[in-house]
Regions:
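Alpha-helical interface subdomain recognition
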Residues: 1-89, 105-107, 114-118, 143-148, ...
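Short glycine/proline-enriched turns and hinge-like loops at secondary-structure junctions
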Residues: 69-71, 133-136, 159-163, 177-180, ...
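N-terminal glycine-rich flavin-associated loop
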Residues: 88-106, 135
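Hydrophobic, small-residue-rich alpha-helical packing segments that form membrane-like cores
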Residues: 132-133, 148
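Flexible, small-/acidic-enriched active-site or ligand-binding loops
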Residues: 136-138, 189-220
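A short core secondary-structure module
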Residues: 151-196
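A short, charged helix-loop
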Residues: 212-237
Length: 388
């Protein structure tokens, strides 16, 4: 069941498939049994190969040394990387196109381009204890003679334990744009940054999601992205892309789950015949394939719309449709596959058990399923079905 891809996109897909299958998947169980950790030399190899394959440069313009990959090519890559558990595919950072619109040359050289080469690692500090999908930011950026003073607490700062700088969203406390948002680069060693605690989550990742408190942290004006008030616009750009790539990863996870369930059901003997001969098992497999096929079509169609330069408001809704459907379908598929595998599906050494835990958060982060439904409904009511 393949989406027709042109030669360039197929080349990206095949490269990612080999990387996932040959380099990452063989290390999943060791990572699972060691709190997500792998030997340093293995992690270094994964990072080096990912960069050599161009994955860290996909969304970077050619003039900055990037690959300028189309969105459909990026979706093809992340679908294959989504077949891997334990977030082992998070072995590289990738700058996003909106950064090259927002950042000064100095910021690009200091913060953004080193992500592509692997010399630096970022983390996003957006969510707060009293805000999530609605991005009701309480962290403030108050004007100071030498820049801004940042104060507030950020939750779920993904990969902060591996990062050396934050991309933080704050509400402007004063000035002509008071009440609007801005984004800031903040080096991790800035005075006033406090690690509050590191919660333990259901998945087994080496990348943690800690809580940080920013205590009157001084940030120079030169580290603000874009102009005052642009923060939400750039966050929307990030959310659109991330939601689409989550959909792609969910499609990859669902594909692997179905393959494993099919292989198991075909060889597991029950009452003298393969489990796959049972019609209830066949129904579960059929439902899973149907949902996967629908999720892939939705996701690749949204990628095509991106590449064709369609209206941003329409794209925002389409990415929400893709994330909503693909993430919820992948969760249903994981549940069925655990059921098909029986007790084996509840063993951490099997991918089905790991996906069962890991996929759950895809219905929460980067906008909950409920928020995606609101975005979709509002787009429908404003622009009609043909305008979406």
């Amino acid at each position: 069941m393949r989406i027709p891809l042109d030669q360039a996109a197929e080349s990206w897909r095949a490269r990612a498939a080999r990387f996932a299958t040959e380099e990452l998947i063989p290390w999943e169980v060791e990572a699972e049994l060691n709190e997500g950790r792998l030997p340093p030399e293995v992690k270094a190899r994964h990072k080096r190969l990912a960069i050599e394959h161009g994955f860290s440069a996909m969304d970077v313009p050619v003039e900055y040394g990037g690959r300028n990959a189309r969105v459909v090519e990026q979706v093809a890559v992340w679908e294959q990387l989504g077949r891997v558990t334990n977030a082992l595919c998070w072995c590289f950072s990738e700058p996003h196109r909106w950064m090259f619109e927002a950042c000064t040359d100095e910021q690009l050289q200091r913060f953004v381009l080193p992500l592509m080469s692997g010399k630096r690692k970022e983390c996003y500090a957006i969510t707060e204890s009293g805000s999530g999908s609605d991005v009701a930011i309480e962290t403030t950026a108050r004007r100071a003679p030498d820049g801004y003073r940042i104060s507030g607490e950020k939750w779920y700062v993904t990969s902060a334990n591996h990062a050396d700088f934050f991309i933080l969203q704050a509400r402007l406390a004063d000035g002509p744009h008071a009440g609007s948002h801005a984004l800031f680069f903040i080096d991790g060693d800035q005075p006033g940054i406090e690690l509050v605690r590191t919660p333990v989550f259901s998945h087994t990742f080496s990348d943690h999601h800690p809580i940080y408190r920013f205590n009157d942290v001084l940030v120079p004006e030169s580290q603000r992205l874009g102009t005052e008030g642009d923060g939400m616009q750039y966050s929307h750009s990030w959310f659109r892309r991330e939601r689409l790539m989550i959909a792609a990863r969910c499609c990859g996870a669902a594909s692997r789950l179905i393959e494993e369930a099919t292989a198991f059901a075909s060889t597991r003997m029950v009452g003298g015949e393969p489990l796959s001969e049972r019609q209830m098992i066949q129904a579960m497999l059929a439902d899973s394939v149907t949902e996967l096929w629908a999720a892939r079509l939705i996701t690749y169609e949204a990628a095509r719309a991106h590449d064709d330069g369609e209206d941003l408001r329409s794209l925002h809704a389409r990415c929400s449709v893709a994330k909503l459907y693909a993430s919820e379908a992948a969760n249903r598929i994981a549940d069925r596959v655990v059921q098909i595998l029986g007790g084996r599906g509840y063993m951490r050494e099997n991918a089905a058990e790991r996906f069962f835990r890991e996929l759950r958060v895809d219905r929460i982060w980067e906008g909950t399923s409920e928020i995606q439904r609101l975005i979709i409904a509002r787009a429908l009511l404003k622009r009609g079905l043909e305008g979406m």
